[in-house]
Amino acid sequence: TDARATDGLTEALERASAFIEDGADITFVEAPLSIEEMCKIPVALNGTPQLVNLVVGGKTPILALDELGEMGFSLVLYANVALQAAVHGMQIALGQLKETGKMDQDGPLASFLERQRMVRKDHFDKLEQRYAF
C-alpha cells in the first residue's frame, strides 16, 4: 500500500492488516521514512512476510541486507540500482570519449566477450541456425 505517503503509517499498517486478513501472503508498506518506521512494520503485521523497496535517492533509508532481514523484511527490491549504475558508467565512458576523442578500452567497460556472454549470443546464434531458412 502507498497509504504511508498520503495518510500516514498507521493507516498504511491498517490497510496491510486488512490485506493479510483477506489472505495476502506478503505485504508492502511503501516508503517508510525512518529506521524507526521500518522496524514497526514487520512487528505490527505479526510476522507476515514483508517487502521493502530501496531506491537510491528515495525516502526509505538504505540499510544492509542483513539489517533488513533482522528487522523482518523477507524481500528487498533494489529499485533502479542497475539502471543508475549503467547510466553512471555510460556518463563516464561517453565523457571520456568526448574529452579525449577516443575510446578508453581499459575504462569502465565490460569486455566484448562479457557482453556476448551476458546477451547469450551463442544461444541465439544456435537458434538462428536451427530456425533460419
Q: Where are the language model's segments positioned?
A:
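Alpha/beta enzyme core
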Residues: T1-Q96, R130-F133
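Extended, intrinsically disordered, low-complexity segments
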Residues: L83-F133
